[in-house]
Amino acid sequence: MTLSISIFTEPRKADVEIIEIKGTGHPDTVCDNIAEEISKDYSRYCLDTFGFILPHMIDKIGVLGGLSNCEFGKGEIVKPITILLNGRLSKNLGDREIPVEQIAMSAIKNVLNRIFLLLNVDKYVIVQNNLHYSRGPGVVLVPDQNNERYDYYTPKAAQGVMHARKDALCNDTSVVVGYAPELIGERIARDLEAMLFSRQFKASYPFVGTDIKIMLVRTEKHISITCCIPFICVYTPSLEFYKIQKEALKNLITYFLQTSHPDLSFEVFLNTRDNYEKPDLYLTVIGGAIESGDEGLVGRGNRSNGVINVTAPMSIEAYSGKNPVHHVAKVYSFVAQKIAREIYAKSGFSAEVYLVSQMGRSIHDPWKIVIKIVGVLNPDLD
């Protein structure tokens, strides 16, 4: 392990922030949630059954949007949504079979039912099962095979499972980053998202779907926000209703922001593509674009900290669906963020923490650690 610490006396320029959040109903976020749910359920099954987690990677989930017809007061899905179940899950340990398809299908259904309350999953969702058990590159076939990767996803015994050992090895050569503190733009975007997905909001605005997107641009003390908020057609009886409620939502968001941060100025835009003459509106059957052709993939959405902040250091590795034992993007993402937050909590200095892995190296021993700190470092700081 090599540790490098750089200390800067000038803070990172923080007068501009650009933050994006993809809500729970966005196709990319749907894929992230499905992948993570499958990994968690599979890991829990393995821990309960074997005492350790078997090799798996389910981080390539995709979705192909369906087709819907929307009218004021009613709508229907006319072509089903397709979930691409891509990835690898160990299907057995010796003679003990693991119900991988059942685990995956149950997780998919649970996620979709949780996000889209009006979606009939059994009727309008197709799952294309692309699970496989290929061992991956690196196994040279020789007599008296002794490479534990030969049966990587079909292990014959516990002693042949690298995940059962304490010295788990990194699955990839990669880099992740964590930083602290989050700036005001991130906090505002998170607070707005939390408000729009709160139980109180849902109870007051049942016509609002879950495929909400927030784009925030802060320039010093002025913040511009564009929100894309879907309306559910069965709860939207007319164009006039849509117009009135859209304006009400805009006013609500503006009021929420201004009362929470009176020292800042705000301008709010909502559903900017709307054309009342055509009409072309963000009107949906179940509350998301997934019903009408929009595709999604794991890793294209929010980072592990819940936002997409292109004005801060950002990991490009997907973390959803990664194996929690040795997948760098899963393990190091949380470790890097934890270190950065602890540095900030103890010193008051902003910090960026970069963890670089090396394939085949112990995950407990990062290849390189790079830490950037803004401030005068106290030599007595632990």
Ranges and model annotations:
Residues 1-19, 152-169, 218-223, 227-229, ...:
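N-terminal, Lys/Arg- and Ser/Thr-rich interaction peptides
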Residues 1-53:
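N-terminal, positively charged regions that mediate nucleic acid binding
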Residues 19-20, 81-88, 173, 225-236, ...:
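Short, hydrophobic beta-strand segments
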Residues 44, 48-124:
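Glycine-rich, N-terminal phosphate-binding loop and its surrounding beta-alpha-beta segment
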Residues 108-239, 245, 253-257, 261, ...:
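Glycine-rich, mobile lid/loop segments that gate access to catalytic sites or pores
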Residues 275-289, 359-379:
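Short glycine/threonine-rich loop-to-helix capping motif typified by GTGT followed
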Residues 277-329:
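Long, contiguous, structured domain-core segments that constitute the functional module of a protein
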Residues 317-353, 373-379:
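C-terminal structural cap/anchor segments
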